[in-house]
Design a protein with these regions (language model features):
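Mixed-charge (Asp/Glu-Lys/Arg
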Residues: 1-37, 43-217
């Protein structure tokens, strides 16, 4: 792609579509912002406080008599847990800012491995006092090779300095990483440690961790 604004929108929408499918596959309900302001996705997943695990709603099946006196079979989705049948389902909420990078071919490694340069733009506006806010940075190598780096906005501090002037005044601090097809970050920084990206990669499980903001009372 040429890098125009239109191309960036296309790759951005592609990344969001791929991420939405991955989240849906893992049981999340995915809602996209109607107006593009702060967060791209709001995702929900039902959690049973009684079972203390993620559960879907119970679909009750039974028979009933219709107006003509005929016996019919029917089913309805209830508000109850599918396992314990208690009214104990709560919705876990996560807010996600999605970033997608297509990458620019870079210099190969000494072993001849192909590498691309990807840029991640952290923005201070997303660094709120709310642990339910996450970044999903999507590395698109090609159609068959897509990696997802999932982390809290506060985790930017693990690989960048949030106090530098450019981050505080321009709202657009760029981190450029050399990444191979498998999604391994090859940067070896002296000021910053990029090993955190190994923990971030395909870290969809972190979205399910119960955190301080998950208060239903």
């Amino acid at each position: 792609m040429s890098g125009s604004n239109g191309d960036k929108r296309v790759i951005g929408l592609y990344g969001e579509m791929r991420l939405a499918m991955e989240l849906h596959k893992r049981g999340w309900q995915v809602y996209s912002a109607y107006i593009d302001e702060k967060f791209d996705f709001v995702i929900l997943k039902s959690y049973c406080e009684n079972c203390q695990t993620f559960k879907d709603a119970w679909t009750r099946e039974g028979t009933y008599i219709d107006k003509k006196g005929n016996e019919k079979k029917g089913k309805t989705v209830t508000q109850l847990c599918e396992t314990c049948h208690q009214d104990s389902l709560k919705m876990l909420v996560r807010f996600i800012q999605v970033k997608t990078s297509e990458g620019i071919p870079g210099k190969k490694t000494k072993s001849g491995e192909e590498v691309k340069k990807y840029s991640f733009h952290a923005r201070i506006r997303y660094h709120l006092a709310d642990s339910r806010i996450f970044y999903a940075w999507i590395q698109v190598w090609d159609e068959d090779n897509v990696n997802y780096y999932i982390f809290k906005t506060e985790d930017v501090a693990l690989f960048d300095n949030l106090q530098i002037v450019s981050y505080q005044t321009t709202d657009n601090q760029k981190t450029t990483l050399r990444i191979n097809k498998e999604g391994t970050v090859l940067n070896e920084g002296t000021k910053h440690d990029y090993s955190a990206f190994e923990d971030f990669r395909d870290n969809f499980d972190c979205l399910e961790d119960l955190i301080e903001g998950d208060c239903w009372k």
